[in-house]
């Protein structure tokens, strides 16, 4: 984060990175970055999506851009993100990053909660976004995956791909 304005940061990063990978992830979900999750609110999310797509077009790039979504969003945010994603042909959503809900673990821990405690919440978001987008947006399922059964569960709920951090 070099500037106050996220769009300036994303522009700098996109122009440096778009030739180097197979896809780009815009992580709007980190619980450790103050204010970052505010970018999942509809007006902010739409600005980011349209800005990134404009940058991609200006650079004659076809690189897929995926957006990592927080598990700690409201039902309205889910609907708004789904509608914006459909209207703007978003390449995919990564569901989900760590949660700030510590009800299932020691509440004194700092940072976000991941691993097994995130599994059910991640699955809920996968199911909801798959339904809200009628399966038209690719979903990468992540969170609480420990074995093949966990992978199958996420795929049955609508995940197209799976991402595993550590198990």
List each language-model region with its residue ranges.
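Short beta-strand/loop segments at the ligand-binding rim of alpha/beta enzyme cores
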Residues: 1, 55-73, 129-141
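Active-site glycine- and acidic-residue-rich loops that bind
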Residues: 1-11, 38, 45, 66-86
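Active-site beta->alpha loop and helix N-cap motifs at the rims of alpha/beta catalytic domains
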Residues: 1-25, 30
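Generic structural signal for well-ordered alpha-helices
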Residues: 10-18, 42-53, 78-83, 123-127, ...
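Structural preference for beta-strand elements that scaffold enzyme active sites
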Residues: 23-25, 62-66, 91-94, 137-140, ...
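Glycine-rich phosphate-binding active-site loops on the catalytic face of alpha/beta enzymes
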Residues: 28-30, 91-102, 144, 151-167
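Glycine/Thr-rich beta-alpha phosphate-binding loop at enzyme active sites
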Residues: 31-40, 44, 78, 83-135
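Catalytic cores of alpha/beta
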Residues: 73-87, 130-135, 145-162
């Amino acid at each position: 984060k070099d500037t106050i304005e996220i769009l300036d940061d994303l522009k700098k990063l996109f122009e440096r990175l778009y030739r180097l990978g197979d896809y780009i992830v815009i992580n709007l979900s980190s619980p450790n970055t103050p204010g970052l999750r505010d970018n999942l609110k509809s007006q902010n999310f739409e600005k980011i999506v349209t800005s990134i797509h404009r940058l991609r077009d200006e650079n004659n790039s076809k690189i897929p851009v995926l957006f990592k979504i927080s598990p700690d969003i409201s039902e309205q945010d889910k609907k708004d993100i789904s509608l914006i994603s459909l209207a703007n042909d978003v390449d995919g959503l990564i569901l989900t990053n760590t949660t700030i809900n510590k009800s299932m673990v020691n509440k004194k821990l700092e940072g976000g909660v991941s691993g097994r405690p995130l599994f059910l919440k991640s699955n809920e978001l996968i199911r909801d976004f798959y339904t809200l987008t009628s399966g038209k947006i690719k979903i990468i399922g992540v969170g609480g995956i420990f074995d093949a059964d966990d992978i199958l569960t996420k795929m049955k709920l609508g995940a197209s791909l799976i991402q595993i951090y550590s198990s």
